[in-house]
Amino acid sequence: MHKHIDNYTYLTQAPVHHVIITMAIPTIISMLVTGLYNIADTFFVGKIDTQATAAVGVVFSLMFFVQAMGFFFGHGSGNYISRELGARRHENAIKMASTGFFSSFFVGVIVLILGEIFLTPLSLMLGSTPTILPYTEDYMQVILLGAPFLTSSLTLNNQMRLQGNAKFAMFGIVTGAILNVILDPLLIFTFGLGVSGAAWATVIGQAVSFVILLLMTRRGENIAIHFRNFSPSLQRYKEIFYGGSPSMMRQGLACIATMSLNLAAGAYGDSAIAAMSIVGRIAMLSFAVVIGLGQGFQPVCGFCYGAGLYDRLKEAYRFTVIIGTSFLIVICIIGWIISGSLIGVFRDDPKVIAIGVVALRWQLCTFPLNSLILASNMLAQTCRKPWRANILAAARQGLFFIPLIFILPAHFGLLGVEMCQAVSDIFSFTLTVPIVVYTFREFTREAAERKTKV
């Protein structure tokens, strides 16, 4: 509810820039805090040694996979809910909310069980070296306990956000993240748990977020979760697939990309793995604002598409891209200037810093391109353009990155590893532009058809 205006009226009639910023701010805060608690693990574990830092980076690829499951059900069910609320079909939205939530929780339990059974082979598959393996196993066996909480929390978070209730989602995510940051130094150093202490801090934070988000579904205009509304059907899972497969593709490929990066960097030692892990965390934190802005755009996009308000949808997209690009240009300039100090905060190792600075500066060069890439992916995903959304989701860390991480190091050595993401971003941007142009031309035709029917 926004100043006594219901969500439908607010999202389809209030000034676009005001709506997007209002929707985006809670999401940006959630993304930033989540990014900070990911960085907190790296920061505090970095005080142990380089191998511990590298181990967290290795397990991070598993976290991408678990997040992929949560985003699959969260975006899949949430995008459907958004369109159905925009079209005033509330009963469909209510059943989808519970179906998405319980399905994601069950998948998290399966990941937990299989991960614990195959702990050592999984650690090696993710890119762990013999010197890193003991740290990786200590960290991973605890992190897996949080899989059901993480998948279902991400589902609830995205469902609430796509209903236009991002403030409720923010409260749950932020509380868990802050608790994680507080617990990290206590469990790692005070209680002497080392790298497993960082994992316990993360799991406890995820469990708290889960409980709060579940309680938040009963507040405001949120759709409450009830097992009686759990209605699995082929049609509902088909809708979840259409809306969620781009997110699963994006996160799943991020998992494979991180594994591939660890393997490629591992050829140059543990310092290279640690450096690339640190750069990845910094990049993720930098993108938090742009992703949050894009997620603020999504409920506007879903409601407007469901209501047939194509001009408003186009205006919202343009605003999102311009603001996001402007922000990333500023980050690019600042990051270039302080890159050495930034890497040094996490690991005061000259070799790690030297590798990290080069990799970070390469990525900074193409940062501004990512606003259009991300917004276009969210546009296609929310408006049920699954194949385009999947292609765009696969581009940055799959279609281009994975082949490049094997090709570039073969020709340029360590520099090939460091420049890989930047080269992938250029190719992704080149692919995105014609796809988004075609999509808006399609919207123009759809608008004309709606007018003809009226």
Where are the regions that the model predicts?
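Small-residue-rich hydrophobic transmembrane alpha-helices
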Residues: 53-113, 150-169, 275-339, 370-389
